[in-house]
C-alpha cells in the first residue's frame, strides 16, 4: 500500500476558467517542487478537456465521469475549458 505524503484538492466542486493551471510544484515546506502520482478528476454536467504537464496531448473527460491517473508523475495540469464544474484530488507518493 502506497503512503501519500502530500495531498492537493480543489476543496469541493469548483467552476473552471479557460487555460487554468493547477500547479503542484509550489513551494510548500517541507515538500518543495512536489509532483503527484495520483490524480482523480470528477466532472459533473459538462465535459472537460485537460493537458498534463507540458504535453501537447489533450485528454477529454466526459460529463459526469471520474478520471483517474495513477501511473505517471504529474507536475501540473491545465484546464482548457471555462464554465465546467469539476472536483479534483491529487496525491504524491512517498
Language model region names:
Residues 42-60, 88-91:
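Short, surface-exposed beta-strand/strand-loop-strand elements in extracellular ectodomains
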Residues 18-19, 25, 55-56, 61-66, ...:
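Tight coil/turn sites that cap or link beta-strands
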Residues 18-51:
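Beta-rich globular "head" domains
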Residues 35-39, 71-86:
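Noncatalytic modules at the cell exterior or secretory-pathway interfaces
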Residues 1-26, 81-94:
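C-terminal interaction-tip segments
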Amino acid at each position: 500500500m502506497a503512503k501519500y505524503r502530500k495531498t492537493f484538492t480543489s476543496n469541493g466542486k469548483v467552476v473552471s476558467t479557460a487555460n487554468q493551471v493547477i500547479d503542484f510544484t509550489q513551494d510548500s515546506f517541507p515538500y518543495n517542487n512536489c509532483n503527484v502520482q495520483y490524480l482523480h478528476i470528477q466532472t459533473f454536467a459538462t465535459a472537460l478537456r485537460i493537458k498534463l504537464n507540458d504535453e501537447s496531448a489533450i485528454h477529454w473527460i466526459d460529463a459526469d465521469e471520474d478520471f483517474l491517473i495513477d501511473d505517471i508523475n504529474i507536475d501540473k495540469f491545465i484546464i482548457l475549458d471555462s464554465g465546467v464544474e469539476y472536483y479534483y484530488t491529487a496525491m504524491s507518493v512517498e
